[in-house]
């Protein structure tokens, strides 16, 4: 038995999909455990580029099981569209398994999400407006509708009818928007459920059986630690737990069955949406990183905010997710920058702090303390191993490992699978 969790160590968009896809080659099951179609990941497979939002990266390997876990919130319409997208490209999806306990996103969740973000104005969170937050709110309030409910028309109708009474009052009286009629949703969404019902099962059983049979299971996180609802920059966070601890809740696999946690970090830092960002760059270097790194959101197309590597952030990720390994991505984007900076601490009211503050008010006042390192000019996109990297690039990686306290076990120097390199296997048993 061997299991590996892949988590983002920053604010998402670290390249988790690429690393998950790479590690999937040696896995026999791949599972997502939180989030929904608010997070996109781009995967290159057999020369083709795919953009997925719900379905795990392992879907391209027909001999491997791909799991949408119970901790996810699933938009049935988006799922059907994503399945069609894959089928149109000739991808076999018969290896997909969808948890019967996962909650679903309905049109009223999306409308409420949009309206609430609009109402907040300058205080908006920066949500993707996909209905994720409202769906998780219903789950916590115990009025959510699960996939198992969607597949039973009578149960679905009963729960939907009950919820629409409350949601329509909220939409019409508070947001002054039009509500929904039962028939507007019932037939359409029941129909979506019927299109994917053959994939639905108890995925906790599937995953535990795989582990008990000695198979390798890979757990794929969405977003990143800094977007975790408990450990992130609250309230500028997602509505679930991307940290490694979220695996046990969102997949139905106990913590004793988790072996390694791989934190994926960009060689710099990016963020989409609002909230404090201590190392953010507003100069030509930041603009250059954004363009070379193609830093635009997979889901929204929004330009990402760009900054220097922040070891305070990744140390926080190491502690709250129990990172055993680090995968450093997009090193090639930094090529040609004469002097690189790494944030080693913050200055807050004249004092040096090395741990990430809980208070956003404090974080907004933090000034980064930088350490400068010489950059490199050599093209590194064709390197085949760690030893092939320029000395300055290796020193940069080594310093990141020292500052974060996590060994760099993988690194990537480009978007293709062949540009990801292993320093130490994360599938090791010890």
UniProtKB/Swiss-Prot annotation:
Cofactors:
Mg(2+)
Q: InterPro entries, alphabetically?
A: Adenylosuccin_syn_GTP-bd (IPR018220), Adenylosuccin_syn_Lys_AS (IPR033128), Adenylosuccinate_synth_dom1 (IPR042109), Adenylosuccinate_synth_dom2 (IPR042110), Adenylosuccinate_synth_dom3 (IPR042111), Adenylosuccinate_synthetase (IPR001114), P-loop_NTPase (IPR027417)
Q: Which GO terms describe its biological process?
A: 'de novo' AMP biosynthetic process; IMP metabolic process
Q: What is its main location?
A: cytoplasm
> For Mg(2+), which residues are the binding ones?
13, 40
Query: What residues does IMP bind to?
Result: 13-16, 38-41, 128, 142, 223, 238, 302
Q: Which positions bind GTP?
A: 12-18, 40-42, 304, 330-332, 412-414
Amino acids binding substrate:
298-304
Tell me which residues this entry annotates as catalytic. 13 (proton acceptor), 41 (proton donor)
Q: In which pathway does it act?
A: Purine metabolism; AMP biosynthesis via de novo pathway; AMP from IMP: step 1/2
Q: How is the cofactor bound?
A: Binds 1 Mg(2+) ion per subunit.
User: Where does the protein end up?
Assistant: Cytoplasm
For this UniProt entry, the molecular function terms from Gene Ontology, in alphabetical order, are: adenylosuccinate synthase activity; GTP binding; magnesium ion binding
**Taxonomic superkingdom:** Bacteria
Gene3D superfamilies linked to this entry: Adenylosuccinate Synthetase, subunit A, domain 1, Adenylosuccinate Synthetase, subunit A, domain 2, Adenylosuccinate Synthetase, subunit A, domain 3
Q: Which reaction does it catalyse?
A: IMP + L-aspartate + GTP = N(6)-(1,2-dicarboxyethyl)-AMP + GDP + phosphate + 2 H(+)
- For whether the record's keyword set contains Kinase, the answer is no
Q: What is its EC number?
A: 6.3.4.4
Per UniProt, subunit arrangement is: Homodimer.
Q: Which PANTHER family match?
A: ADENYLOSUCCINATE SYNTHETASE (PTHR11846:SF0)
Its biological purpose is as follows: Plays an important role in the de novo pathway of purine nucleotide biosynthesis. Catalyzes the first committed step in the biosynthesis of AMP from IMP.
**Record family assignment:** Belongs to the adenylosuccinate synthetase family.
Protein name per Swiss-Prot or TrEMBL? Adenylosuccinate synthetase
Q: Which organism is it from?
A: Listeria welshimeri serovar 6b (strain ATCC 35897 / DSM 20650 / CCUG 15529 / CIP 8149 / NCTC 11857 / SLCC 5334 / V8)
From the UniProt record, report the name of the gene that encodes this protein.
Answer: purA
